[in-house]
Amino acid sequence: MRHRKAYRKLSKPTPQRKALLKALLISLFKHGKIVTTLPRAKEVTRIAEKLLTIAKEDSVHHRRLVYAWLQDRELVRKVFVDIAPKYKDRNGGYTRILKLGMRRGDAAEQAVIELV
């Protein structure tokens, strides 16, 4: 049974899963919107919400926490200077998931994640 499991495994070993989520996060913050499968979208949303909540308060410690996921100084600067200030008065709900339907090749459910 799947009771009290903290996250989705996405049918990948841990290092592969972390690399996938990191790549999706980087794309989300660079482009503001990405298309992926629904389970991946839900996992990326969880992490993106946490990172944006951290980024709302600018400090060296918070920048290091965000850098641990993004690994790109310019992108961290963009998150703290451009993206996070837009959400200063918002308590969560920084991302939106829109379902796109099934992918033609393998019938996987597609979704768009975008920053609100």
UniProtKB/Swiss-Prot annotation:
It comes from Dictyoglomus thermophilum (strain ATCC 35947 / DSM 3960 / H-6-12). One of its GO terms (biological process) is translation. The keyword Ribosomal protein applies. One of its GO terms (cellular component) is cytosolic large ribosomal subunit. Keywords: Ribonucleoprotein, Ribosomal protein. GO terms for molecular function: structural constituent of ribosome. Signal peptide: none annotated. Pfam families: Ribosomal_L17. Part of the 50S ribosomal subunit. Contacts protein L32. Belongs to the bacterial ribosomal protein bL17 family. NCBIfam families: L17. This is Large ribosomal subunit protein bL17.
